[in-house]
Structure formats: C-alpha cells, structure tokens
Amino acid sequence: MYTSYGEKAVTIKDATGKELTENRIVYEFVDQAFLQAYVKAWKFYAQATEGSDPKKQYLIIEEINRGNCAQIFGDLFQLLDRNGRGFSDYYIHADNDLKRHIYQKFQDNGVTFSEYHQKAIDAVYPKEEESVALRVLSGEILLLPNNLYIWATMNTSDQSLFPIDSAFKRRWDWKYRPIVKGRDEDGKELKWRIAADTKEYDWWSFLEKI
C-alpha cells in the first residue's frame, strides 16, 4: 500500500582502486492517499489551540466496493471503530520500516503535541500504561484522530462488484443518496439528452427507467 521501488547506482572500489558500479533495487515508502491524510489530520490536530476544534481532514474513497475491502484495508480495518470522542477504539502497531517513515513524516511536518494535546489523547485511553500520544508521534502505533473523516461512495445495485461483509459494513454510518436531476450554478435544471441512432431521449427519463 505504501511501497514502491526504484534503482539506485551504488559505487564501490575493488582491490586495485578501480571503481565498480552495481545497480541494486532500493525499496522506499511512497505516501498514498491514506498516509497523506493520516499525517495531515494529526498535523491539524496538533495545530489546534486549547479548547478549539482541529481542522477537519477528509479521505474520499470512490466506489469502495470496486475492490476487495478486506485486502485493501488490511490491518487498517481495526482503526475504523471509533469511540465516543471520535478516536479509534483500537490502535495497530506499525512495523519498523513504517514506524521510521511515519516518525520522519511527523518531523518533516512539524507535528508535535503540546502538554494539553498529550493529556487529551492519553485521557481517551486510561488503561494504557505508556503515553498513547507519544507512541503515535514515534510512529509505533497508528490510530485515527477525531478530525479524520473517511467518506466512501458505492453503488449497492451493482451486483458485479465485490460484496462487503457485515463486519465491515457496521463500522460505517450509511446514508442513501438518490439520483437527482443535474442543475447549473444558478439552480436551473440541466436538460441533458442522449442520442441513440436517429432518436434523442431525455437523460433523466432514461435514468428513471433503468
């Protein structure tokens, strides 16, 4: 989800002092949509002043059921359960490579928690012996802050796509969005039409039929 690779030239010398060049594959993290949103959300959280709400960060997933959600989300699935304060109920541990990468991203973006923020986060997890806030900053664990919103769309009528199991479904709030007539910036109805052979049909009437 986060890695890609590229070639890097490594120069070495043999016993005669002659330079030898060897091409090696070097793996490195390349931030994708989730990690970008994750770092931004914590940055906004850390920037919020005491008593104010942090700026909201949104991660938009279009047509979520076009892929296998269990495979796509992996361990992140556990982060979707939120507690009463909007944080993840459960955190997950990052492996050493991801831990170092997240820590560096936080450093690069100036993400650090004030005493107020640290206490606020730790208060959400009173049973933890170590500071959860500091473990988040170190990259050791991942958990979603209360200003990170994940919104997804899906077409429930399309049976050709991947089914979503009930355990995944219950971790979301669902809202039905019906098809509505298109309108321009002034609110006037867009009278779209489609052509088939020599005839034209009203687009909205076509949608209602199917």
Can you annotate each of these PLM segments?
Residues 1-210:
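C-terminal regulatory/interaction module of P-loop NTP-utilizing enzymes
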